[in-house]
Amino acid sequence: MKSIRRICRRWGGIAAVAVAAGVVIGCGGREAAGRRVVVLGFDGLDYELTRELIAQGRMPNFQRLSERGTFAPLGTSIPPQSPVAWSNFITGLDPGGHGIFDFIHRDPKTMIPYLSTTKTEAGGRTLTFDEWQIPLSGGSVELLRRGRPFWEVLEDRGVETTIIRMPANFPPSGTATRELSGMGTPDVLGTYGTFSFYTSEPYAFGGRTLAGGVVHPVDVVGGVVRGAIEGPDNPFLVKPEKVRAGFTAYLDDQRKYVKLVVGDEERLLRVGEWSDWVPVEFELIPTQGLRAQCRFFLKSLYPYFELYASPPNIDPLAPAMPISTPADYAADLARATGRFYSQGMPEDTKSLKTGVLTAGEFLEQARIAGDENRKQFKYVLDRFDDGLLFYYFGNVDQVSHMMWRPMDPQHPAYDPEHDVQHAQVVEELYAGLDAIVGDTLARLGEDDLLVVMSDHGFTSWRRSFHLNSWLRDNGYLALLNPQRKDDPGFFGNVDWASTRAYALGLNGLYVNLKGREVPGAVDPGDRDALLAEIRERLLQTQDPATGAPAITKVYRREEVYTAADHEDIAPDLIVGYAKGTRGSDESALGGLPPEVIVDNTDPWNGDHCMDHEAVPGILLTNRALRKPAPTLQTLAGAILAEYGIDAFPTPRKD
């Protein structure tokens, strides 16, 4: 995922300003206005771990559901990546139909990678005078997922739907009665989340650039620190320049707390304390600004000043980009339950990966984000009288990425002294989801349906596979300078004229095909034989540390995708890594490290982008469904069958 965030920083740009120019089942529920269906989407909930915790008696509400209804593994997508998986669920289509194949796609005409679910277009013509330019048309943000979402079918039948934080649904589809966008929603910088860290320590982090964050040197002068929160480029300036909002921190004499002043806002923070949401306004021109919001964490005042600022989130009270349907629904939620993380993946995993926050500090930040979500869920559920409600929880997924290793003493980076204190973190989060299920059941009646599902499972990420390096070593990818075997990314040392195949994204492999890729080197007639050869050799590849296969499945897209509407962006092969092995972050963006398979020593230590059969999700219901749903792709159709709707997926109406 860190590679995905790098794309946001490099190619995301000015999206924001471009657009801105313990219960008994079925008892205790209140009287409902009509029959209700509640779908709880628990991202990354693993079937095996859930089953173990149920057997241990630690998830009593899940157990009651399993005894009354259904508890089964839910087949995930190929590949098992969240935007792909949730798109399968939303549309009832596989990637060949909905067009989302990975977190990362590439333009075969330029070979530039981009985020798969959203495209941002700046405004068109401008009026220029001196250093200023006035856009004569607004920008736009387009959802790239194709296919008809299941809730649109319900709305056409007169069933109101509320879709909260559905991944791969930014900007919101506009076809539900109420929507709030989720995973895929950027911060105002146009990234998936870029934090700021202000420090008076000279040469902090060795002067290196942090992945997913920016270090800002500051000075303490007379007990005062002055700094600035960075926003996006100002679209009204001919020469690009970032907008900034200044802040001042006044230190007390004992170095125990600061008074933080941001615009008209003041906050008193002690060391180790998080602020609430602080409104931030970036001035674009004297008559127009861009509103955002940040949370601050005062990490230290001695010996150095250290202040963390969250990514500047879209302000739900004045959204710079569309994040809800209707447009004022986000503001309604914020007024009712308080400001909240509008960023699609709010848990700041990058701050932990870079060492800006400790594990304990990260977990506190994740708890704050999770508490906001649970508070909002209670508000929405209390007002849900009829129709279908989908509500998404992503806390377990993001924390599992960072905290799976403490449960795995066999992980190569396992540290008994450090990890033992976090060994129960993930399991405690599972217990928290069990409590959410209990609260939901308490509000449902006898005729209501509860569906609990996850998009994929989870496991330990022990070994990293550099797929582009494997292609290099096996003669499929050529280098301009063969003596240089440490290309950091974006194919900077690739000799395209002699390259037959390359990898991009977490599971995709592409033929360098004439007529598709601009630097194409392989005749279309040679494609099939080349793919067969690469697949056979990949499946024979063993991990030198264990002697076991490193890759257990390799699919041709024609074998697993039913449509071929996206041949320009679809990978030719989808690689299913053995459980415990994942494609590397370096290879995902065109990097070619010297070795092929290495230990994963990254703080990001749990994952699911492997062989899809190794990481199924879960399906749990309070009664048997009328129609079976063995996979994510069939689940929405099974839910629609509860309403007497059998034909799904259906074509989108023009």
Please annotate each region the language model reported.
Residues 3-15:
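Bacterial N-terminal signal peptides that target proteins for export
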Residues 25-26:
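C-terminal motif of bacterial Sec signal peptides marking the signal peptidase cleavage site
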Residues 33-35, 42, 56-57, 67-73, ...:
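Secreted, luminal/periplasmic, and some membrane-associated catalytic domains
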Residues 39, 388-392, 451, 620:
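Structural motif
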Residues 46-52, 139-140, 625:
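Second-shell loop/turn segments in exported
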Residues 125-134, 359, 405-424, 593-600:
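A solvent-exposed, charged loop/short amphipathic helix patch at secondary-structure junctions
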Residues 578-627, 635:
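Low-complexity, glycine/alanine/valine/leucine- and proline-rich hydrophobic stretches
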